[in-house]
C-alpha cells in the first residue's frame, strides 16, 4: 500500500512566461493523460516559489486551481476541492508528497495534484542567467492511493547548520517602484559542496530505511548545478541518473517532476525497481524519498 504517481504533466512552451499559466497547463495535461476529471481532485498543492509579479495575495495555488479548471462551480452537492501554497524551496515537491501521503492514506481525497515551477517575476524572460539562475517551467504530479506495493516511501528531511548557502529576496532598499519585477538571488561560495553533503545524508537515510539496493535504483535529484545529480549519484553509489532538460537552466522546484516525466516518456526507467528522489536547496535543507516503480515502470504516467 502506498501513494503512487498516476500521471504527470509539464509545460515549457515559450508562448508565456506566467507560472500560473504554465502550472495550470501542466495540471490539465496530467488530468487528461490519466483520464481523471477535475472534480476528482480533492486537493491541489503548489510548491513553486518564484511567481508572476511577486504575487503575495491571493495564494498562487488558487490562481493555478482556476487556470486548471478545478473546483470552479459552487453548487449544492458538488465535490469539494481546495488548494494551498507550500513554499520550501527546492524541497517543496517532496514536502508536498509528505502532505499528500497523509491526505490519501486517510481517504481524505481521491487524488492530490502537486504543481511546481518558477518564473522571473518580471515575466520578461524564461531562461536562467547569472542574476536569476532559474528557468521557467511548470510541472504536475497527480497522486492517488494504491493497494499495490508501489509508490512513495517515507520522506526523509535534513536541516543543515550555518548560513543558508542559497537565498533570494526583494531588496526593498533598492527596488523603488519596480519591486514587483525584481528578485535578488545569492549563492554563497562553495554552495554546491554544502548542498551535496546534506543531500547525500538525506539520500542515505532513505536508502537505508527501505533497504534499497542502489544498483537497481535510478536517482532523480534537484539541479542547483548541471552536474549536481551525477555528483550525488557517485556519492551514494548509484549508477543511473535521470535529469530534466537543462538547456534553459535550472527548473528549480519543477526539477524532480520534469525529470520523472522525461524518464517515463523515454522509457528509461524500465529494468529498474526504484527511483530515489532527492532535493536540496536553501537552508541548507534536503529531502529524499524512495519511489517503488510498478512492474511496467512508469506505464501509468
Per-segment meaning from a language model:
Residues 1-49, 53-56, 62-72, 141, ...:
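Conserved "HGTGT" condensation-loop signature of ketosynthase/thiolase-family condensing enzymes
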Residues 54-182, 263-301:
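Acyl-thioester C-C bond-transforming condensing/cleaving domain
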